[in-house]
Each structure stands twice: as C-alpha cells, then as structure tokens.
Amino acid sequence: MTTVRLRENEPFEVALRRFKRTIEKNGLLTDLRAREFYEKPTAERKRKKAAAAKRHYKRIRSQMLPKKLY
C-alpha cells in the first residue's frame, strides 16, 4: 500500500503529485487496469507474444543504419 505523509507547510496539491508519482513508479495503475476485466489465458498469451514481437522489431529498427539520403 502506498502512503504519502504531508510534510510541514506542504500544500495538498504537492502531496497529491508525489502520491501520483509513487503510484506510477510502482506500476499499480497499469496493474489495476489490466485486472479490471477477466482476460482468457489464450488472449493473454496472444497479447504478450504480440508485445514481444513489437519490442523485437523496435530493437532491430533502432540498430539498423539509416538509409543514405542522396
């Protein structure tokens, strides 16, 4: 559980921003959105496989030399 304590003379908006930042770093929001609805195991495997392929092609694209511009 994520907790943020208000510091002395700290505005609420700043504390809320710190809370949002810690939630984002922990990945709680993405995990919550992923678990919001049930996903079949086959659909989950398919989604993860597609994401892995996308990462692979992205890595290959970044390692390729740029085309010469004539």
Curated annotation (Swiss-Prot):
Pfam families: Ribosomal_S21 (PF01165). One of its GO terms (cellular component) is ribosome. The keyword Ribosomal protein applies. InterPro entries: Ribosomal_bS21, Ribosomal_bS21_CS, Ribosomal_bS21_sf. GO terms for biological process: translation. GO terms for molecular function: structural constituent of ribosome. Keywords: Ribonucleoprotein, Ribosomal protein. Belongs to the bacterial ribosomal protein bS21 family. PANTHER family: MITOCHONDRIAL 28S RIBOSOMAL PROTEIN S21, SMALL RIBOSOMAL SUBUNIT PROTEIN BS21. This is Small ribosomal subunit protein bS21. It comes from Polynucleobacter asymbioticus (strain DSM 18221 / CIP 109841 / QLW-P1DMWA-1).
